[in-house]
Amino acid sequence: MSLRTELLKSVWYAFTSLDTEKSGKVSKSQLKVLSHNLYTVLCIPHDPVALEDHFRDDDDGPVSSQGYMPYLNQYILDKAVEGTFVKESLHELCWTLTAKKNYRPVQTALSNRDAFHLWCLFNYLSEDSYPVIMVADEVQYLLQKLLSIALMEVTEVELGDVLSSLSPVVTVWEFLQVMTSPKFLKSMSTETLSIAIQDLYEEVIQDVLKQGYLLKKANLRRTWTERWFILKPSSLGYYLSEECKERKGIITIDKDCGVEILPDRDGRRCMFCVKTTSKTHEMCASDTKHRQEWVTAIQTAIRLQQSGSLSLHRELQKRRREQRELREQRRAARELEMQRLAELQNEKERQQQELEQLREAQKKSEEIMLQEQHRHREQQEEMKRQLECQLREAEEARASMQAEMQLKETEAVQQKQRIQELEQLQDHLQEALAQEIRARHDEEAFRHAQSKLLMQEEEKLRVLLRMREEQTQYVERAQKEKQELQQEMAVTSKELQEAQKQLEDVRENRERADRDVQVAQKKLRQASTNVRHWNIQMNRLMHPISPGEKRIVSGSGFQGLWGIPFTRRDSSLKRLQTLDGKDHTHPAGEHVETFH
């Protein structure tokens, strides 16, 4: 803790004691008086006129424009030099101001001097923050030091009972209340407590490492004289008596000093010496225990000088703070670890719950899947039944189609047979035509006689034309029926294409049969045309000659010309009429004249 921090803690108490309204504001007149007293106790030269200017009532002064804290740092604390003033005077000034307002002693348990010393100890060991507080560990350390100095043995249970009423952080007034509580004073007298407080104050505040009577060997006369020694980190002073009114000398302690235990000689026992760079100082303790205590204390002072530390208790306080911080870090780490473990446990429980939920969801999904599979199987079975039904219908349709195709094939065979018969008839007709042509040459001479026959032949021609038209209509109806049949077959083929693809072969066979039928029909039409043509010719030639006509011919010549051909025409005409009766139906009232 720096000098500024140490002084500022005491000044903070003085300032807060002047802030009666707890608003953080103090009148300028009070601050001017406080500042003047601080200048005085810190031995800082100051100009009263300048002080009056700083605290003027207008808003131009540094206190009005900046506030008191910057003024305190700039004009007072920055000018304070350690060693030029007595710290205790500053502490007494601030204690006087704050005690009037805040300290209410209980009867006479503590004197005002002892309370002041405890206040100084509290500020020394308090935290470097505002408001000034002390942690419970430092309170416990301070109480244990007091009890140790007072040679009082207090158990941890009793000490814990004293500290149980305190919060984790303690103000100085709460601390003084504990020091005056019956729990703490029940086994200690007021005088013992006062002595312990004084010794602890000297040890902690005044940095007294060790004090007591020792025999010192004079440097010139070599005589031994009893002196009161006070050991501090930087010096070992000795006085005429323990009142410390007259100092006889001082031994400066630095890092190059040393201490040694000397053997007994000249009737002196428990001797030791302190070696400095310029001189060796011999001393003698009352017994071995006291000598060892002094040697240890001097070694501590030398160690502090070597380490650059000016105060043992500052170093101890720093270590305790580091230990507290380390404990806090460990505690925070433990809490963090416990929190992390709790989070891990919660996460584990959450994952367990999620796992259970997943298991339940999986179970439900499996049930749904089984139901879906069952439903799918039922759908498949239903679809299978439908397909089987469709397949049966397709098979039936195919069988029907096959039967129809067989019927068509039978009809085609019959048509083929008729075509063959017609071809044979055509051959006969061609042969008859050849004969008729020859007869025509023979009959050219009789054209005039046969004019009437020509008229009749024209009538027959009209009849044949009507028959041709009827035959054409019949062929058109057959083609229309064929087209309708093809359309029905195409629709049936499309419906059965997915169920049975083998029907395509049947359809191809049917198409080939249709082409054969078309060829046969074409041939039939050609044959019919030829038949009609030859019928016309035959009818023309088959008209009988009138009996009144007389021709001069020989019997053998007439018989040779007409006998045999007329017989052949008769038989051929009868066969033709038989075939035409099967294929054609003549209209009512019409007939074909034949030669008898």
Curated annotation (Swiss-Prot):
Annotated signal sequence is none
Which terms are listed as keywords in the entry? Coiled coil
Residue ranges of coiled coil: 311-541
Pfam families given in the database record: PH
The record, for SMART domains, names: PH
> InterPro entries under this entry?
EF-hand-dom_pair (IPR011992), PH-like_dom_sf (IPR011993), PH_domain (IPR001849)
SUPFAM superfamilies found in the cross-reference section? EF-hand, PH domain-like
Q: Which CDD domains match?
A: PH_SWAP-70 (cd13273)
User: What are the annotated GO cellular component locations?
Assistant: cytoplasm; nucleus
Q: Which residue numbers delimit the PH domain?
A: 207-303
Which sequence ranges are marked TM in the entry? none
The cysteines joined by S-S bonds are: none
Show the PANTHER family listed in the entry: DIFFERENTIALLY EXPRESSED IN FDCP 6 HOMOLOG (PTHR14383:SF2), SWAP-70 RECOMBINASE (PTHR14383)
What's the name of the protein? Differentially expressed in FDCP 6 homolog
The gene behind this protein is def6
